[in-house]
Amino acid sequence: MSRYIFFSGKGGVGKTTMAVATAVYHAMKGEKILIISTDPASNLGDIFEKRIGHAITPIMPNLSAMDIDPDAATEEYREKVIGPMRGIMPDDIMKVLEEQFRSACTVEIAAFDRFTDFLVNDEFDLIVFDTAPTGHTIRLLELPVDWSKHIEESAKGSGQTCIGPVSSIQGAKEKYDRAIAAMRDASRTEFKLVLKPEKTSLAETLRAHDELSTLGIRNFSIIVNGIYPNDEIARSRYANLSTMQVRYLGAIEKALPYPTINVLLQSGEIKGPQAIKDFAGIVFDGKNGVVDSRIKESMRYDNFADGTALADILQKKYNSKMVIITGKGGVGKTITACAVAAYLAGDWHETLLVTTDPAAHIGYVLDEPVGATIARTKALPHLSAVRIDQKTAVGTYKEKIIADAVRSGYSADMLIVLKEELESPCTEEMAVFEEFSHLTENSDFDYIVFDTAPTGHTLRLLELPYDYARQVEMMVNIKKDNDFASDAKKKLETLVKKLKDSDHCTFLLVIYPEYTPIQEAKRTMDDLALAGIHVQGIIADNVLEIDESTPDFFRRRYGMQQHYLGIAEKTFRLPIFRIPMFDDEIIGLPTLKEVSESLFQRECCPERSGYNPNTKEIML
């Protein structure tokens, strides 16, 4: 009977690295291992230095890997459900079925359905799940419960779900029930919570722990990753970070009293078979040694774009402008979004800062609560903030759909079916998108800055207009007087036009100057380009600075960064802006101002009185 290990944690804490090291370690012990990534922006292949796709791929003796590709999973799922009906059902019925299975609902359930296949699989001794960042991992793990309940309730009612009749997916309910039982079985399943000794990472881990516990999951262990070597950092300009980490290590021990492994930050990247094996030995067997950088020489990178160029990029010809910040989990998107918003608000522009990430952190950076309704921040008079809250968005979305259906003349029976479909788990995805779309229409602000979820999920959010456009077209064709569908179609067309218009919307990619974030950002840029959306700038975060007293550990990491900054320039061929590594956490306006000033290379948020050039008001 297979055992399972799930890795969960905030983006950028090293989940994939720790999952890979765990899989390799057990494989070297002679166990038959499969590692699976459920992250839409998987980087398993980057770490193994081998192409991995939507099929089980041999990596080394006893170890195979697989990336669950949402598109491939959707096609497989669609064919599994409607394939047997071909040649039996009339062509016009098949056309309707095929359209129904091109919905956003199908995309969500298909990837999740493939994931649950492995929770009822006994072919391997151990299956390691490298999951997406926590907000989306929680969503994935809730789905077996949600879908099982939805199928059960639909069977009692109309017998219909948003992805077809209950009769065609009843067998799935049994599989989902077995998956739920496997996840809750502490003798078979372990959840490793990976975090860094930092405020946002600890807060998100505690939230994940609580939510997983409510799902009936009990078997936890902790990996604290990215700890600086004390003797090295104490002699550097970043000595304050060591004091901060010691403080959080104590807090982690008290808040999460589970078996814990502390892992030192290495001076080189964990990439390639030998580096992974060496790292696994250091972490799990306590072997002496470090994983050093394979980059021995590098040219100093001096081609950062001037901050005024970033200010110019943000200037658009429309009154209401959008700025969308995206990138790999943990590269500093939230801090960058807050810094950009602070600069704009400090320059007298009415600015709205929005987070679409389920694990919202803008409140931690601003050091004040950010709720589900738009509110002015205390820190800056021209800055407002809001987070898209899934539960609130779902409630609002359901009420709106039902009200529109009533106005469109739906019968009582049709409303019953609609209400059942709205209980579908995929309603949450639609509701979040609807709220995102609604915020882009807000004309009260000069700028709307979006702090998005990690790249795979941001791309999914930005694909939704195209998915829903197909569904709306079908709704309009089916019921010509459907006001809701007609209105939705117009809104979708407007949103897609805005996203593609570089005079209206600015896309900025955030990277660390390391291999994996650069590769993921390049894939994101290419995917966006296919949708007609063009990235306009790259922001390199956590860039090290050195001087005569810098110890070897930081010199080696500095050399690695300089090498990858050169690669980033050739890869993106876009202006690269710089945020240096700071010696403390970015929490509150004083440190946020420092970030903004380093990025834009000018004073941020000055205390001003006098003439406002944007509104032509006299401020006293």
Stretches with model-predicted labels:
Residues G11, G329-G330:
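Walker A/P-loop nucleotide-binding motif
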